[in-house]
Amino acid sequence: MIIEYEVMRMKRIKSFFKILGMFVLCASFTGCGVNGNVDDYAVNTGYGDSDTVKSSSGVSKDSIKVGVIHLSDPADGSGYTYTHDIGIMGMQQNLGLSDSQIIRKINVNDSDKDATRKAIKECIDEGCNIIFSTSWGYMETTAQMAEEYPDVYFSHGTGYMSNGKNFNNYFGRIYQPRYLSGIVAGMNTKTNKIGYVAAMGSENSEVTGGIDAFALGVYSVNPSAQIYVKVTNSWYDPAAEKAAASTLLNMNCDVIAQHCDTTYPQLLAQQKNVYSIGYNSDMSKDAPDACLCSVIWNWSAYYTAAVQSVIDGTWDGSNYYGGMNENIVGITQLADFCKSGTQQKVDEAKKDIISGKLGIFDGVIETNTGTTVGESGKTLKDSDITGNINWYFKTVTLVQ
């Protein structure tokens, strides 16, 4: 078992260096401070005072310990947890920390508050100075633990709670590369039916915002295409993800995108000789003949800056919401079998996103229920994007 783990660890190391080639890693931390373009991103949690405060003293690099709570096992080699762990390894590499300074808790069910609390407490007992809880469902328990242990720093990924002191939230503008991947899908569909396997329904703004950004990207190049969404109601459920992808394929969808944690949608797309859009990590290795591109994370940009701030004593409790400008999110190189002209359309939109000309959720947007959101000449606020997108764009159909 030890040998098997080390083999998987070496594979992750190789993948880490591959990802280094995709991103500029902000090794000097220039341009990727911990707050990363927060704008009006919501801070208040209901737990304690929300006024941001700087940490009073740092922690020596030799003595710092970093805890990580993972939803699944990064040894799986693809998907959400794998990508976060690549980010942790990047942080470790950038800061020169030893393996003994990284404490991992894996396969922690984020719907089990007792299991979450136990994992966090174990990290505290093992001397961790900062703990990253990487899944949405860890949010409330992490907030509670932060109040109980004010001398430990807590950082929660993908949610919205924080206290402005020892507990912050981090995420990224993943809707930006989602939009670009929508362009890719819209350019390459032949049936004008595009499937999307979603972990959560419209109640979850993270997932729904990604779907809408993707649909807007599709619409920008192919207004005739329709997006069909099948929800699994779980962040990580291999069987449900496989079943959802199968349902969409049976509807004649010829591009399958996803916001879920396994590679099953990619694998099924390859088996059925249709296209796919990967998520979290580069999934072309899993479905080389299907994957048009992948929407990916470079979590090491944030993890490095956050841990460095604890070492330096400059942690201020602010939230992080970086985007393509901060290199925390991106899109992989397009497959060489993409339709001619796809790269040009992606490059044009990417340039506009980075310059700020294109905000994705711009102007008046029509929903699939006939209502509208947004205002002419304005872009949705960060707080709306992260917490209030509970609607679907007009070309989206929810599959029951």
Placement of each model-derived feature along the sequence:
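Bacterial N-terminal signal peptides that target proteins for export
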Residues: 10-20
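Generic extreme N-terminus detector
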Residues: 5, 13-14, 26
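C-terminal motif of bacterial Sec signal peptides marking the signal peptidase cleavage site
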Residues: 27-31
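Short, Lys/Arg-enriched N-terminal segments with co-localized hydrophobic residues
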Residues: 1-9
